[in-house]
């Protein structure tokens, strides 16, 4: 065993006196050396705590006999030290925990980290001042140097058995005053949960003893799948809106193109390009079928005949609506009929037996297109000639000082200044002249409409004949083509 000289301080609970006794432990049997004042101890050389023996009521430990009694009591005590140590720690645990919490609260308020003190070397002197129940008492423990001779043995630093009692380092056994808590090892930067200003959260404490920096809460996770689905839905809606807008623009452009195609077909007579089926069904330009056109033509003819015989005013109103729509078509129909008659006579005179069916069809279609293209400018020229051939109004003779009146009457427009310069009689003459012109124009319009209906009927009949001839020619051509390979 290791030899060490220690001073044991014995506290007297009744009188407040203490006595010191020196003893040495050398690991030898005390029975063999009864006269000696040495005692056996298991305190290690690294333990720097004060060994306190329980005080007796009327005796002090200064006599050698008292030392022998303590040593014998220590040797007779056979209870295992770890079990006894556990019991004592359990006794002191509630008070120690309360004191530890108070000390930790003070350290938290001061804002520095309570680091554990480094291990003391053998020979260091530590002083602890404790306040007892009756007044301030101090206990000083000095680590004696190891004994040079004797058995050296390293003991547990917490093995404090002397006389059957476990003595906590730095505590008098009989004092019931405030006790200093035994500091337990704590994890680095750790604190009791729910204590201090940063309770409920993680507090990072810098190693240099700075203030506690609370850790920021973690960012909540993002639901990327839901976000991607939402963005895809928005893109799909935008694409639908774009498609709808493009469809609208396409429909408007298609309507415009259809109008242009209708105008071109009306001008160039593209019904020959559409094939023979167009003559019995509605064309792309919206032209009605042949049977409906024939029936409407007969109804129009009867309607105009009845209206012309019954009421002239209604004829005048109808003429105003029909002039803007149908009058330009009458010379065109006349011209087209004349060209068609001339073409039929030329076809009858020529010998077409040598020509192929397809070539003859293409030739006839080209001639029809040329005739229809020339019809519109020729109709305009004819209208201008008719205007020049008209007689001047008799109002020009009544108003010699106003030569421009006749021209204004021909254009059917008079200025307010001219009307203010005229007398009532002159204005009455102009009104009567205008009524007479209206009647004559209505009669002329009725005649032209009748002619137009007749020409439409002839045109429909000719188209039916052309369709029949085309079908017959196609069948003949197929029959001839079938016979040629057979031969």
Swiss-Prot record:
Modification type Phosphoserine: residues: 117
Domain of life: Eukaryota
Molecular functions (GO terms): identical protein binding
GO annotation, biological process: positive regulation of hippo signaling
Locations listed in the record: Cytoplasm
CC terms in the record's Gene Ontology section: cell junction; cytoplasm; plasma membrane
Keywords: Coiled coil, Cytoplasm, Phosphoprotein
Coiled-coil regions listed: 424-458
Tissues where this protein is expressed: Preferentially expressed in brain, skeletal muscles and heart. Also expressed in detected in pancreas, kidney, liver, lung, and placenta.
Annotated Basic and acidic residues bias: 14-27, 107-123, 153-162, 309-323
Ranges of compositional bias, category Polar residues: 242-255, 324-335
Amino acid composition bias (Low complexity), ranges on this chain: 32-67
Pfam families named in the record: SCHIP-1_C
Residue ranges, annotated region (Disordered): 1-74, 88-221, 236-260, 308-354
Comp. bias (Acidic residues): 92-106, 344-354
Family in the record: Belongs to the SCHIP1 family.
Subunit record text: Homooligomer (via coiled coil domain). Interacts with NF2; the interaction is direct. Interacts with ANK3.
Listed name of the protein: Schwannomin-interacting protein 1
Source organism (scientific name): Homo sapiens (Human)
């Amino acid at each position: 065993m290791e030899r060490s000289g220690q001073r044991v301080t014995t506290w007297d609970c009744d009188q407040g006196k203490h006595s010191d006794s020196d003893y040495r432990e050398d690991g030898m049997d005390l029975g063999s050396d009864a006269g000696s004042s040495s005692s056996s101890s298991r305190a290690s050389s690294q333990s720097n705590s004060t060994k306190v023996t329980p005080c007796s009521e009327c005796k002090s430990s200064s006599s050698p006999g008292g030392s022998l009694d303590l040593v014998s009591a220590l040797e007779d005590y056979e209870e295992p030290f770890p079990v006894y140590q556990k019991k004592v720690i359990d006794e002191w645990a509630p008070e120690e925990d309360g004191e530890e919490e108070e000390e930790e609260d003070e350290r938290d308020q001061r804002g520095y980290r309570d680091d554990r003190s480094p291990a003391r070397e053998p020979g260091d002197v530590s002083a602890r001042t404790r306040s007892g129940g009756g007044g301030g008492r101090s206990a000083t423990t000095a680590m004696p140097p190891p004994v040079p001779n004797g058995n050296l043995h390293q003991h547990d630093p917490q093995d404090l058995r002397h006389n059957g009692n476990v003595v906590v380092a730095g505590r008098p056994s009989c004092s019931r005053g405030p006790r200093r808590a035994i500091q337990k090892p704590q994890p680095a930067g750790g604190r009791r949960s729910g204590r201090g200003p940063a309770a409920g959260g993680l507090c990072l404490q810098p190693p240099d003893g700075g203030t506690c920096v609370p850790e920021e809460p973690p960012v909540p996770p993002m639901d990327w799948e839901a976000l991607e689905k939402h963005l895809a839905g928005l893109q799909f809606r935008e694409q639908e809106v774009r498609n709808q807008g493009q469809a609208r623009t396409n429909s408007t452009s298609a309507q415009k193109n259809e109008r242009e195609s209708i105008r071109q077909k009306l001008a160039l007579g593209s019904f020959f390009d559409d094939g023979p089926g167009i003559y019995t069904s509605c064309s792309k330009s919206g032209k009605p079928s042949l049977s409906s056109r024939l029936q409407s033509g007969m109804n129009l003819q009867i309607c105009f005949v009845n209206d012309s015989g019954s009421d002239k005013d209604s004829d005048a109103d109808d003429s105003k609506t029909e002039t803007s729509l149908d009058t330009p078509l009458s010379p065109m129909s006349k011209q087209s009929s004349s060209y068609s008659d001339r073409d039929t006579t030329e076809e009858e005179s020529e010998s077409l037996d040598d020509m192929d069916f397809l070539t003859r069809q293409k030739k006839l279609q080209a001639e029809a297109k040329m005739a229809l293209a020339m019809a519109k400018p020729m109709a305009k020229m004819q209208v201008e000639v008719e205007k020049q051939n008209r007689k001047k109004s008799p109002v020009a003779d009544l108003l010699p000082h106003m030569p421009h009146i006749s021209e204004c009457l021909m254009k059917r427009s008079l200025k307010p200044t001219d009307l203010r310069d005229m007398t009532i009689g002159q204005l009455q003459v102009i009104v009567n002249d205008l009524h007479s012109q209206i009647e004559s124009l209505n009669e002329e319009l009725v005649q032209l409409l009748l002619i137009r209906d007749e020409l439409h009927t002839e045109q429909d009949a000719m188209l039916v004949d052309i369709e029949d001839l085309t079908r017959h020619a196609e069948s003949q051509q197929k029959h001839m083509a079938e016979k040629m390979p057979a031969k």
